[in-house]
Curated annotation (Swiss-Prot):
UniProt gene name: clpP
Name of this protein: ATP-dependent Clp protease proteolytic subunit
Cellular location(s): Cytoplasm
Active site: S123, H148
The protein's Enzyme Commission number: 3.4.21.92
GO CC annotations, alphabetized: cytoplasm; endopeptidase Clp complex
Amino acid sequence: MANINFGFDHHAKKLYSGAIENSINSQLVPMVIETSGRGERAFDIFSRLLRERIIFLGSPIDEHVAGLIIAQLIFLESEDPERDIYIYINSPGGSVSAGLGIYDTMQYIRPDISTVCVGMAASMGAFLLASGTSGKRASLPHSRIMIHQPSGGAQGQETDILIQAREIEKIRHLLEDLLAKHTGQEVSRIREDSERDRWMSAVEAKEYGLIDQIFEKRPAPKSEE
């Protein structure tokens, strides 16, 4: 039996080697104290952001992370199917299957999805950034965005390796087709540009069609204008 793994994991592991243990799950998560007529109540920062319909993707993407993101998306749709959901992305990418699970859920639920790159959206992170609702995909000015082809490795019998190679090629075609759909680029250009790591600034990502806007400063509330 072949020992097979493929996806965007290689890039994520390369960037985060020695640092994954310091991911968001193992850090001290800040608490927010909220005061109401019933007294004080403490929330972890991510639960508090979720109340504002904000999801933070700040780690490599694996099945566990995907499960959490998918659950939050479905919950927020059940709370209000008409209000936008905001996903802030700072991720080096990760598993294709896990990322596609998030992608399919983003397309499936009713609310518009606003995606924002804060820091880096690479590999599957860039794919999810581009997959937000058209007109509602953004980046902060000094973020970096990177696209590339899926990588994979297999060992075992020759027939198993050939089967896996064909599967990787199918996945590559699928991702190229979807990225072309969301960016407006030709599939042939997506294939050429993703042959190797293609890094972009926020301005370049906007020109490419990965995002629609560059946020430099949050607008003041209307009452302050």
